[in-house]
């Protein structure tokens, strides 16, 4: 729970700094109840996003399926297998607080699971 609050704090900071609607949407999703938390499989990422994309997942990334694209993913949490598969494909798996610090001003972010 504490980790989620720290992440929410960083995402709010990114929204205040950039005023980009994607960060406001992510804040609203993270503030909702745990029962409504999102989960996305790596196979869905592989199907929906182009190679080299920057993806925001306001929930957990799960390891079902395969991923062949090099993507940078920022998520609330990752399963061990999802993190391994993303890194094996040449991508990066970052927790949402670090992702928000590093890529808050980046254009072309894709929201999956929102």
Regions found by a protein language model. Give the residues of each.
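Extended polybasic, low-complexity segments that bind anionic RNA or targeting/receptor surfaces
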Residues: 1-114
């Amino acid at each position: 729970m504490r980790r989620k609050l720290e992440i929410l704090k960083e995402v709010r900071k990114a929204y205040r700094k950039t005023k980009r609607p994607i960060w406001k949407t992510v804040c609203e999703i993270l503030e909702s109840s745990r029962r409504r938390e999102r989960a996305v499989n790596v196979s869905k990422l592989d199907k929906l996003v182009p190679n080299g994309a920057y993806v925001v997942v306001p929930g957990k990334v799960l390891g079902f399926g395969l991923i062949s694209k090099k993507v940078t993913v920022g998520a609330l949490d990752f399963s061990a297998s999802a993190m391994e598969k993303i890194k094996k494909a040449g991508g990066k798996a970052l927790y949402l607080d670090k992702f928000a610090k590093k890529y808050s001003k980046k254009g072309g972010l894709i929201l999956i699971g929102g």
